[in-house]
Regions:
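Structural register within alpha-helical repeat arrays
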Residues: 147, 154, 161, 247, ...
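Conserved, well-structured interaction surfaces
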Residues: 90-168, 202-212, 220-233, 442-449, ...
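Hydrophobic-face positions in mid-chain alpha helices that act as interaction patches
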Residues: 270-450, 454, 488, 513, ...
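Short coil/linker segments at helix-helix boundaries
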Residues: 164-215, 257-295
Length: 585
């Protein structure tokens, strides 16, 4: 089962060579993708078409072969984003199929798959928009919710895509100079709409940020209007609350950018005059954007009966982080064996279920929290039990001659099974239905995953009011939240007096709360926060102990558009390859 990483990367290169026969953007027809010409205008057919969107969230094997270990849908994108940060080490990297990505030495192929996956997904959303729009224009108003799904999903995908692939300064002179020479600053990715022709695909420039923002906002506005009072059947579909959440994310990205750059703000204001059909943002300052963050975060929080996870829900051994509840605003839906891949190295759950005998844990491949972050979690914070305290790790238990699970942890593991757990191993993500035995490989992977939780909206709101109401008000709000929902004794104090101190305190809470959910990557990038894996006692393998530069984006967080895309679309602008730009200290 253990594989040579060079072989894996080479295999990916072969696959990408096959894909390069046709543009990644141009030819993307996954097997479970509904093509407009195959769909009638009946509501049943339109429902089938719209169902292809949540289905594609969990689609694996989009390269058309089973040898690509980084090809398991949207959860794979989340996993990759977290391993590029600083809180996600592995206990033993012998079976780490992401080693060349995690140590930053060979990144180009790692960025190819997300580019292909996202544009394949966008193709799917465009198909939904094209067909349902025709139906609505033909008088079928019951198709509006399906149209809203298309616009909402497409907005989410472009929001991710531009944040991943836009080049931001790294502090590495050779990279930043190369980016400047290429003219890549301020550019994102090409926009492909349902109306984009094949001819246009061959000359489709990378959109500047000020166009991309307005394009995404326009999609979100269209989605909000189309969804109306739509009541969804499950949380893999979007309703207005999810659109509010996506607007919150977008406004926050803009707010951070314009706070840092008056020139970018001026360009955005000027772009409001463009007659490209995307509408206007109507802002004059970064604080206007922060006010919008606060507004839409509140709308999202109060749009439904959302409430933060309780300790019981968080740590439930059957449903913890695998079953939708009142905290989840949006997520995947996996409820049948037909939706899963039973290769443990090929799924989110195979890599993240520390308790499961069928997972990669059987090869000592545990995803852990970083020592630096774990040390910041108070003993009064019940989330602390989501990771194994070094004093409770298997080697300590064995040395002490104990044969039971230490007190305080909620698990179905026996003492004998616990004795294999390394320090800092995660207990956050539970196997489906609590299926952790060797025979539960199928049952344990019938598990959903949150893509947006209400807690994120609270954190975004706190950051926004730090700018609009002041640090003192935001610090008090954060303190109240943590004491109400996460501490057992109300002892948490947020003592921040400056904006920098508040952002530091807030990021600690984001990193703890959202660990493993693929979201803090975007916070690091928009706030120019450094990655720090090299420090005394670090539990990262030495070759992975990369430290990026303060005040800049870590080089590996600037995804690189595949070079062969330029062969099909000469108008696209490519950023420099960040591989090896920073090495372990």
């Amino acid at each position: 089962m253990k594989r040579n990483i060079n072989h894996i990367i080479a295999a990916m290169g072969v696959a990408l060579g096959v894909l390069s026969l046709s543009s990644c953007i141009e030819e993307t027809y996954p097997n479970n993708q509904a093509v407009p010409g195959q769909i009638s205008s009946s509501n049943k057919s339109l429902e089938y078409l719209a169902n292809s969107l949540p289905s594609f969230l969990t689609t694996w094997n989009t390269y058309g072969g089973s040898d690509y270990t980084q090809d398991w849908g949207y959860p794979c994108q989340m996993y990759m984003r977290d391993l590029l940060c600083e809180d996600f080490p592995m206990s033993d990297n012998g079976y780490n199929y992401w080693s060349y990505t995690e140590d930053g030495s060979s990144l180009r192929y790692a960025y190819y798959y997300p580019f292909y996956y996202y544009y394949a997904f966008i193709k799917n959303a465009n198909n939904v928009i094209s067909t349902t729009k025709s139906s609505v224009e033909g008088g079928n108003k019951s198709a509006l919710p399906y149209l809203g799904q298309g616009y909402g999903y497409r907005a989410m995908l472009y929001l991710d895509l531009y944040r991943l692939y836009e080049y931001r300064k790294t502090g590495v002179a050779s990279l930043d100079d190369a980016a400047d020479k290429a003219g890549v600053y301020g550019l994102t990715v090409p926009i492909v709409k349902e109306t984009t022709s094949k001819t246009e695909l061959g000359n489709n420039p990378s959109a500047p940020f000020y166009t991309m923002y307005r394009f995404i906002m326009n999609d979100l506005n269209m989605a909000e209007e189309a969804l109306g009072d739509y009541s969804r059947s499950n949380k893999a579909f979007m309703d207005k609350s999810v659109i509010y959440g996506l607007k919150t994310r977008l406004w926050l990205a803009m707010a951070s950018r314009f706070e840092q750059s008056a020139d970018d703000l001026a360009k955005q204001i000027e772009a409001d005059k463009n007659e490209d059909g995307y509408g206007t943002l109507g802002i004059t300052s970064a604080n206007d954007c922060f006010a919008k963050v606060a507004e839409y975060a509140q709308k999202a929080i109060h749009a439904d009966t959302y409430k933060p996870l309780t300790e019981a829900e968080w740590s439930d051994t059957n449903t913890g982080f695998n079953t939708a509840n009142d905290s989840w605003m949006f997520g995947t839906l996996v409820n049948s064996k037909e939706q899963i891949n039973t290769s443990e190295w090929y799924t989110f759950w195979g890599w993240m279920c520390s308790e499961a005998a069928w997972s990669m844990a059987q090869f000592n491949s545990y995803r852990c929290i970083s020592k630096a972050l774990y040390d910041k979690i108070s003993t009064k914070d019940w989330r602390r039990q989501s990771w194994v305290n070094p004093a409770d790790a298997g080697e300590k238990i064995n040395a002490a001659g104990k044969d039971s699970v230490p007190a305080g942890y909620k698990t179905k593991m026996t003492g004998e099974q616990w004795a294999k757990l390394p320090q800092y191993a995660n207990m956050k993500f539970r196997a489906g239905s609590g299926g952790i035995t060797k025979n539960d490989l199928e049952t344990g992977q019938i598990a959903s995953l949150p893509l947006m939780r209400v807690e994120e909206m609270y954190f975004d709101y706190f950051e926004a009011i730090a700018h609009t109401q002041g640090v003192e008000a935001a610090a008090q709000a954060l303190q109240d939240f943590v004491n109400t929902y996460r501490y057992t004794d109300g002892s948490y104090k947020c003592k921040a007096k400056t904006m920098d101190d508040f952002i530091t305190a807030l990021m600690v809470q984001r990193r703890i709360e959202l660990w493993g959910e693929g979201l803090v990557f975007f916070d690091y990038k928009r706030l120019n926060l450094p990655i720090k894996r090299h420090y005394a006692g670090s539990n990262y393998e030495p070759s992975y102990q990369l430290n990026s530069y303060a005040g800049y984006v870590a080089p590996w967080m600037n995804y690189m558009i595949p070079e062969d895309e330029k062969d099909r679309n000469p108008a696209v602008v490519l950023g420099p390859n960040p591989s090896g730009a920073i090495t372990a200290e």
